[in-house]
Amino acid sequence: MDTLSLKFRKLKSSDKWVSIFAAVITFLTYASVYAFRKPFTVGSYNHASLIFGLPYKDALIISQVLGYMLSKFYGIKLISELKNLGRGKLILLLVGLSWLSLLLFAITPAPYNVVFLFTNAFPLGMIWGIIFTFVEGRRATDFIGASLAVSFIFSSGFVKSVAEYLKVNYAVTDWWIPFLTGLVFIIPLIVFVFLLEQIPPPSKADIDSRITRLPMNKPERKKFFAEFRYGLVVLIILYVFLTVFRDIRDNFAADIWRELGLGNEPSVFTATEIPITILVLVMIAAMILIRNNRRALVVTHFIIVAGFAVAGISSWMFIHHQLSPFLWMTLVGLGLYMGYIPFNCIIFERLIATFKKGGNVGFLMYVSDSFGYLGSVCVIISKSLYSNKLPWATAYSHGVMYLSVLGVAGTFIALRYFNKKYRREFTANAETQNIPVFDNELMLNIKTANA
């Protein structure tokens, strides 16, 4: 008995260290990838000409977001059908193509170099899905996925600080900042991708808890979506809201800080994102303690509701001069990421595990992302064309405030739908299997479904 107990403790310890290793490596890998994505946003490009009536920087952002959007639509097929072989090489190939685009952006005169932000974004848009396939379908996926997801909160601010440092201390021009920032991170990225491929596959206990995750062909994708269509449509709409406002904050953070009088402080980008990263990581990683997938799905909806509330209330206080600019940017970021991060690591993972349906998170995530970036493109173009004189800080604070009301209502609608569907399916399964109504476990699950 003592020998068996010792083996069990070793197994648990091994699982724990695999989870920690996977969390650290996925965090560092995706953080390094961000160095090829966001550094261009620190540039002001003040002397560049308008492009089709748009400010040059707005045109750059639109070009990149268009690349992400089309990448996500293409990724619905690529990521959902992805096999396990050669994933590390694929990551490096995609990043290499993206980095080459940044070199072409630097050496091609404006405005013709705008197209290279599109070619920079298209390969990068598929990397999150590839990385997530290494950690999906595990009992610790909530913890590992949280680490992966919050990496872009921290890294977005960190790589901008690195880019701003290069700009201020080495007089790097706006056009060369993206390529040289990528150069700083290229060696670490290669190392992290190698370590990423050393992550062991899910254990038998993982599979028993979260079911096996398999590639999905087109008929399987259609069948899965049709079965949950109403709840998924609501979740996708919510995700569009969150993506739009998270993306505006991410892309125009430098402009917002300049309007708020803090544009010449490189550390400000990291100062707001570090506490957000820590708080969201702790909150989301704690979901690993909830073993019941059904209960975790419900709790995730309430986290999203809380995120919308934090973002909305902090914006209302900022508009009415009850909150400092720095605290507002921190709290609105915290609220948006409380809503945004669960989509990237928990809600679809627990949805699949709750209903025991074959599939993978990549499919659902890329459907959501494709429409999210489509929404970002539309908002950025509309703002640039019709209200360009309105400061970003003003437009953003008011937009987030109204968003929060819709977000809270929509999240409760989605929760109600999944509650009802679970209750119907569980009752049908119980009747099919002739489970007696006095079965204690059955009654506990029914209470959970009605919670």
Predicted regions span which residues?
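Glycine-rich segments within core transmembrane alpha-helices of 12-TM secondary carriers
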Residues: 141-168, 184-185, 365-379
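Intracellular loop-helix junctions on the cytosolic face of multi-pass helical membrane proteins
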Residues: 1-17, 167-236, 259, 290-292, ...
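Transmembrane alpha-helices of Major Facilitator/SLC transporters
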Residues: 265-292, 307
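Extracytoplasmic gate region of multi-pass secondary transporters
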Residues: 38, 230-262
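Hydrophobic core of transmembrane alpha-helices in multi-pass small-molecule transporters
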Residues: 112-127, 322-340
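C-terminal ends and interior cores of transmembrane alpha-helices
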Residues: 94-109, 288, 304-320
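Intracellular juxtamembrane helix-capping segments at the cytosolic ends
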Residues: 40, 125-140, 253, 338-356
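Central cavity-lining transmembrane alpha-helices of secondary-active solute carriers
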Residues: 58-79, 275-283
